[in-house]
Amino acid sequence: MLRRTSLTIVLAAGEGTRMRSATPKVLHQVAGESLLAHVLNAAPRGDGASLAVVVGPDHAAVSNEAKRVRPDAATFVQRERLGTAHAVLAAREAIAAGADDLLIAFGDTPLISAATFERLRQPLRDGATLAVLGFRPADPTGYGRLLVEGGRLVAIREQADASAEEREITLCNAGVMAFDGRTALAILERIGNANSKGEYYLTDAVAIVRDLGLEATVIETSADEVRGINTKAQLAEAEAVMQARLRRAALDAGVTMIAPDTVFLAADTTFGVDVTIEPFVVIGPGVSIADGAVIHAFSHLVQAVIGKNASVGPYARLRPGTSLGDGAKIGNFVETKAAIIDAGAKVNHLTYIGDSHIGAGANIGAGTITCNYDGFGKHKTKIGAGAFIGSNSSLVAPVTIGAGAYIGSGSVISRDVPDDALAVARGQQAIREGWAKRFREAKSRGKAKDTGHAKDAK
């Protein structure tokens, strides 16, 4: 049997005024990805699948996001906002190409799944002309009701037009639809705007399908899957649902979470086996954590790769470009950025490692700072395998510390250090026997006039 081709049109032209934000609504994020990205990633892909995104005239950023997520996406502009059917027909050129299945979705429903799109296509394979996604909200007030007779959809009745009996129906319209591509354009072009707002409503397609003697049907899904985002409160609710999904998926994959509700994940986080995540950890986009790694409490990771049996935290911040080798350790109050830390290396306390490469087995003492920025550009620090950096050292980049080299505590290193060498760069220690006693005696007699280290007692 030949695989059916598909066109998915994602409507993303809404202004989103209730978000109270300068950011287009569909670019707000859930689990580290834009609302639009979640929908695009759920849409069919691969051979025979095409994608179109309808944007507003002033939303170049939305077009750019669509191309970032799905380079195969075509974008079309809805220059006037005249209803959902009008928005779909902005992509008339794509529809006319004649895919077998036409899917219509919304860019502000980030919880919809690929499986739901596939279920919505099944009635088309079975001969239906139109399939509408339905759901049962806790409170159906305000939603269009789906009127079903004999297993077929006969109408979508808006709340204002519904009879008292129809308002008792709990099956509601989610807005997501699938059309048989052979008849989709003809049906869409028959939708008129004879209503109080003068707009073209996609819901009118049901009546047109019925008038043509064709079949419309309903596929039901959960209310969460079609949760639309119009306010910041709804955005937070969607985040909570997504985080619950991600946590459960991680737990089912074998990740140990001591307090799952305190852990926040990104949609693209990947885990190996026997990973442990302690409480109050935030994992942003682009993080992969290999087998046996432990992420201790109160750590924050973004765009970082964690090797097997590595350890992070507690209270660590791993910024983009961090790569932690197998068995390496990042300890408490350590920040890394664009740092490659090879297997077995240790950065245990109170340290900043930026634009650096640390060799295998190196030890970075507490309070070490890689001074990577000169006010104009970033510079690289290279620390060889097995090197030992004493506590409270400053490494002024660009600089290379050779393999096996030792850096004395408190040093400021601005020149390269050869392999196996010792480098010390600090003021010499001076000891004056009895000075402290004489100073205290002088103070007690009121002879010391200042509050600093006074005059030297001779």
From Swiss-Prot:
Name this protein carries in UniProt: Bifunctional protein GlmU
Similarity comment text for this entry: In the N-terminal section; belongs to the N-acetylglucosamine-1-phosphate uridyltransferase family.
Lineage: Bacteria, Pseudomonadati, Pseudomonadota, Alphaproteobacteria, Hyphomicrobiales
Pathways per UniProt: Nucleotide-sugar biosynthesis; UDP-N-acetyl-alpha-D-glucosamine biosynthesis; N-acetyl-alpha-D-glucosamine 1-phosphate from alpha-D-glucosamine 6-phosphate (route II): step 2/2; Nucleotide-sugar biosynthesis; UDP-N-acetyl-alpha-D-glucosamine biosynthesis; UDP-N-acetyl-alpha-D-glucosamine from N-acetyl-alpha-D-glucosamine 1-phosphate: step 1/1; Bacterial outer membrane biogenesis; LPS lipid A biosynthesis
Keyword Transferase attributed: yes
Organism: Rhodopseudomonas palustris (strain BisB18)
Binding site for UDP-N-acetyl-alpha-D-glucosamine: 11-14, 25, 78, 83-84, 144, 158, 173, 230, 319, 337, 352, 363
InterPro entries hit by this protein: Bifunctional_GlmU, GlmU-like, GlmU_C_LbH, Hexapep, Hexapep_transf_CS, MobA-like_NTP_Trfase, Nucleotide-diphossugar_trans, Trimer_LpxA-like_sf
Pfam family, one: NTP_transf_3
Compartments in which it is found: Cytoplasm
Binding-site list for Mg(2+): 108, 230
Origin superkingdom: Bacteria
Renumbered residue ranges of the record's region Linker: 233-253
Residues that, per the record, bind acetyl-CoA: 366, 372-373, 391, 409, 426
GO molecular function per UniProt: glucosamine-1-phosphate N-acetyltransferase activity; magnesium ion binding; UDP-N-acetylglucosamine diphosphorylase activity
HAMAP family: GlmU (MF_01631)
Keywords: Acyltransferase, Cell shape, Cell wall biogenesis/degradation, Cytoplasm, Magnesium, Metal-binding, Multifunctional enzyme, Nucleotidyltransferase, Peptidoglycan synthesis, Repeat, Transferase
Annotated segments matching region N-acetyltransferase: 254-458
Residue stretches spanning the membrane: none
Disulfide bridges in this chain: none
Cofactor remark from the record: Binds 1 Mg(2+) ion per subunit.
